[in-house]
Structures are given as C-alpha cells and as structure tokens.
C-alpha cells in the first residue's frame, strides 16, 4: 500500500515536471500558426514574394533571350553559371534581404503596428514567444527561398537542355548539387534569421545595422582568415558544391569543413536565441515615436 502511494506521488511529481514542456510546445505551435499567416498573407509579404521571384524572372528572360557566352552553350558550363548566380544574387541579395525583412519585422513590425502588447499580456513565457516567432520566420524563409533556389536551377537548365538536364538531375551529379544548394539556403535562413531577429529587437531603426552587416558580409573576401570566420557567408561559401573565384584581390583562406560549418551556425543560432529570450524577459513596451 505504502509502495503504491509512493509510486503515485512520484508519477504525479514527474507529470508536474513534464507538464510545462507540453504546454510550451502547444503555445509555440499556436504562435507559429498565427505568425505564419501574418508572414504569408500580410501586406508586408508582397515585397517578400517580389524578392523571391526576382532570380526566377531574370532566368526566364535569359531562357527567352539566351546569351552567346560559351558557358550557356553546353550543360557542363551551366554549373559554373548557376554558382555565380547563386553566390551573387540568390544568397547575398535575395536570401540576405529577404531574411532581414522577415526576421526584423517579427518584433519590430509588432511595435510599429502597436500590437506587441497583446502577446506580452498573454500567459506566455517570453522565451516561448521568441522561439515561436523565430520558427515562423524560419519556415517562411526556407519555403520561399528554397523554392527560389530550386526554381532557378530549373529555369537555367531545362529550357536549354531538357533531356540532358533530366539525366543530370535524376541520374547524375545534379541532384546532389541541388540538395547541397538547398541545404546552404536553409543554413543561410537559420544564421541570418538569428542575426536579424536580434537586430529587430535591439534597434529602433534596424536599417542601418542591416546595411552594416551587409557590407561586412560583402567584404568578407578581403578580410584576413581569422576575421572571415566572424561572418555567416564564410561558412556558407565553404559548403558550395561548385567553388567560385573571389577575384585577384581576395585574401586566400582554407574553406571551413562542413562538419565544422554546420554545427558552428547552429550553435551560434542557439546562443542568439538565448540572448533574445533573455532580452524579451526584461523588455518593456513603448510605442512612443513608432
């Protein structure tokens, strides 16, 4: 009798300890659902759709009016062409500014709309709110920019070499390259998303910090090897399936292996989310000047 009582008490205590985690997961999923609707259906989403469609539109134009360059005349040269397009346009412009728009507005947009207090008055831990909002931005950016990456590959290859492209992607190395590019896009959304979440939380006008970060990422090829590692783009470029020359003025540095690059970005993201959660616990709402 005594043993069953102790077992019941132990089970109750264990359930009490586990119950908050179940509640936090439910609250996170609820926030995720609400924020996804905002991210995809609000007026702010229009700019995001235009940005995501930009590379696809440009490649569509190139499919109609193909250049005379040798790289466009054979399927083997297209891998270098896509590496150039992905590095300069998709990764450094579309994904970067798209993540800036999505993640900076997760909290900053609520302040501008004067609606953040609804969340803060709800019985939700601030850390749960941060995780739910971050996940919503992550899902939004990965879906949109992942589709941009794959659609850009399709628009570059298939209009020119339809049968060869089918064999290249479904039987050759193209499928693996497509997955790697998709993985790099995902990691970019994870890393840049964490950075711009913090920027949106700490700065009343996040545009200037975002431009400074953009400049730092762009001059990465000029930085000494140690400083290169203090950027997201270094780890992303290290994973490229088709490396691209950074020009004659680039400071040479060894690419960081994937087994270091991927965990480094994930650990960095966790640290930033912890900092964001700590900040929101002490955050007071003031709509003055917004």
Question: Model-derived features: where do they sit?
Answer:
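Junction motif at the cytosolic side of a transmembrane helix
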Residues: 3-7, 198, 267-290
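Transmembrane helix-loop junction
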Residues: 38, 109, 122, 153, ...
């Amino acid at each position: 009798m005594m043993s069953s009582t102790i077992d019941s008490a132990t089970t109750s205590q264990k359930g009490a300890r586990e119950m908050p985690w179940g509640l936090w997961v439910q609250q996170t999923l609820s926030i995720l659902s609400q924020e996804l609707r905002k991210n995809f259906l609000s007026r702010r989403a229009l700019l995001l759709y235009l940005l995501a469609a930009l590379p696809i539109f440009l490649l569509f134009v190139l499919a109609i009016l193909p250049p005379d360059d040798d790289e466009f005349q054979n399927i083997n040269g297209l891998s270098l062409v896509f590496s150039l397009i992905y590095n300069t346009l998709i990764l450094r412009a579309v994904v970067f500014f798209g993540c800036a728009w999505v993640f900076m507005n997760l909290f900053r947009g609520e302040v501008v709309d004067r609606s953040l207090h609804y969340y803060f008055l709800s019985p939700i831990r601030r850390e749960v709110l941060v995780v739910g909002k971050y996940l919503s931005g992550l899902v939004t950016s990965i879906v949109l920019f992942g589709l941009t990456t794959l659609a850009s590959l399709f628009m570059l290859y298939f209009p020119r070499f339809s049968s060869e492209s089918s064999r290249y992607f479904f039987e050759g190395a193209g499928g693996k390259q497509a997955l790697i590019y998709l993985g790099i896009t995902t990691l970019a959304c994870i890393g840049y998303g964490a950075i711009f979440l913090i920027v949106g939380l700490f700065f009343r006008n996040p545009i200037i910090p975002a431009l400074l970060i953009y400049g730092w990422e762009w001059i990465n090829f000029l930085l000494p090897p140690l400083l290169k590692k203090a950027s997201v783009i270094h780890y992303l470029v290290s994973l490229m399936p088709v490396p691209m020359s950074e020009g004659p003025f680039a400071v040479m540095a060894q690419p960081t292996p994937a087994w270091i690059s991927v965990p480094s970005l994930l650990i960095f993201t966790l640290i930033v989310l912890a900092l964001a959660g700590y900040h929101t616990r002490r955050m007071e709402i003031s709509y003055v000047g917004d």
